[in-house]
């Protein structure tokens, strides 16, 4: 019930969810309500390995995999040790930490909870002190690419 649906398509999950409404909710001041590939990849792995996969589980799983495939940024990585910069590196897979609930635009937020859309708009201590992007879905999409799209649903 907490998987976020955008324009009729199943995507990924939020970082935190309300236990009653299942809506994405904020955490710390810079952790806005969102969709996040970091926390979602473990859910997808669990669903891919679920023994008695119902049609609902199958749709949830492949909807999320499709989201990862559509939103990967190839040949870039997040260098936290270089003050939190996004840098070119051939062969890398990258997803940003937070995505809007209604579209696939990524964002960041400072401690004042205001969304910003470039990493350079972050406070330097927050920019280098938090994992704003990562390769979280790399193994997932590499493994799932072995299954043709017409066999997924």
Annotate the PLM regions:
Residues 1-34:
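Active-site cradle of extracellular carbohydrate-active enzymes
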Residues 23-27, 31, 35-153:
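Terminal, non-catalytic domain-edge segments
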């Amino acid at each position: 019930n907490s998987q976020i649906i955008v324009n009729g398509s199943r995507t990924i999950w939020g970082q935190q969810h309300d236990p009653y409404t299942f809506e994405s909710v904020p955490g710390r001041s810079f952790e806005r309500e969102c969709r996040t590939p970091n926390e979602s990849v473990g859910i997808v792995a669990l669903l891919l390995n679920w023994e008695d996969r119902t049609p609902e589980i199958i749709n949830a799983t492949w909807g999320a995999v499709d989201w990862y495939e559509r939103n990967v940024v190839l040949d870039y990585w997040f260098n936290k040790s270089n003050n939190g910069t996004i840098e070119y590196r051939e062969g890398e897979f990258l997803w940003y930490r937070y995505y809007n609930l209604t579209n696939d635009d990524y964002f960041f937020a400072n401690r004042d909870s205001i969304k910003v859309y470039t990493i350079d708009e972050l406070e330097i201590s927050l920019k280098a002190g938090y994992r704003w992007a990562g390769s979280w879905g790399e193994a997932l999409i590499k493994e799932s690419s072995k299954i043709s799209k017409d066999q997924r649903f």
